[in-house]
């Protein structure tokens, strides 16, 4: 882990782990560095802005973890899974990606339509963010609200439909069909999350 990157610091791959709002400050540093392989990790809904850095092989990734930093410690949950890949549908980096994680315990899913994946993820998250706003971060107030959880599902499906009309694929595969065909089950899962620490760590701590 580094917090400084000079022009002559050469790495096989650089993982950029940062808030989306901080990326514009980091990109000039990345451009100035001579390392070729760059992986932007996180909720990035503006992939188009960062996917064509000159002389760089740019990948995007989403790591299955969430948490919040407190004074002196971090409260977190981590599934040790990562979705990573290109944005153009080509599999030319698959072997390189596998080599990065070869001696780790991280479960890797290679997805070479990461722009579609990250936009799909944003669609799923946004209604949950507004749910947090509705109750000022106390999601337990919604744990028995079946009607509202179904409205969340309606919102997610509506967003997915917009994405599809814009030409994007809803990813991971089967996600759209699950929302349509298992709507009540998905709504129940959200109510379960609202009732415990999962909702706090994965939703409200990020939203508020």
Predicted regions and their residues:
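Rossmann-fold dinucleotide-binding core
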Residues: 45-121, 126-127
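N-terminal glycine-rich dinucleotide-binding loop that anchors FAD/FMN and/or NAD(P) in oxidoreductases
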Residues: 1-2, 125
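Small-residue-rich helix-loop
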Residues: 147-198
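Active-site-proximal catalytic alpha-helix in oxidoreductases
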Residues: 115-143, 147-160
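C-terminal helical cap and adjacent loop that interface with cofactors, partners, or active-site loops
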Residues: 198-208
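Rossmann-like NAD(P)(H) cofactor-binding subdomain of soluble oxidoreductases
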Residues: 2-74
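Soluble, non-transmembrane catalytic domains of enzymes that act on hydrophobic metabolites at membranes
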Residues: 25, 78, 90-102, 138, ...
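A short secondary-structure junction motif
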Residues: 104, 130-134, 200
């Amino acid at each position: 882990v580094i917090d400084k990157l000079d022009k002559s610091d050469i790495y096989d791959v650089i993982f950029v782990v940062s808030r989306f709002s901080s990326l514009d400050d980091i990109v000039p540093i990345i451009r100035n560095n001579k390392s070729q392989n760059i992986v932007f990790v996180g909720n990035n809904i503006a992939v188009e802005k960062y996917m064509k850095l000159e002389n760089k092989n740019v990948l995007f990734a989403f790591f299955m973890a969430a948490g919040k930093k407190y004074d002196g410690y971090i409260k977190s949950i981590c599934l040790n899974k990562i979705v990573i890949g290109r944005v153009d549908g080509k599999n030319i980096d698959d072997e390189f990606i596998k080599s990065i994680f070869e001696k780790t315990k991280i479960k890797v899913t290679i997805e070479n339509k990461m722009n579609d994946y990250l936009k799909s993820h944003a669609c799923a998250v946004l209604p949950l963010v507004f749910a947090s706003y509705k109750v000022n971060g106390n999601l337990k107030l919604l744990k028995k609200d079946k009607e509202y959880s179904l409205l969340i599902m309606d919102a997610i499906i509506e967003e997915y439909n917009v994405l599809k009309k814009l030409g994007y694929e809803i990813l991971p595969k089967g996600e759209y069909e699950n929302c349509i065909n298992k709507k009540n089950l998905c709504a129940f899962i959200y109510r379960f999350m609202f009732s415990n620490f999962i909702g706090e760590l994965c939703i409200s701590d990020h939203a508020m």
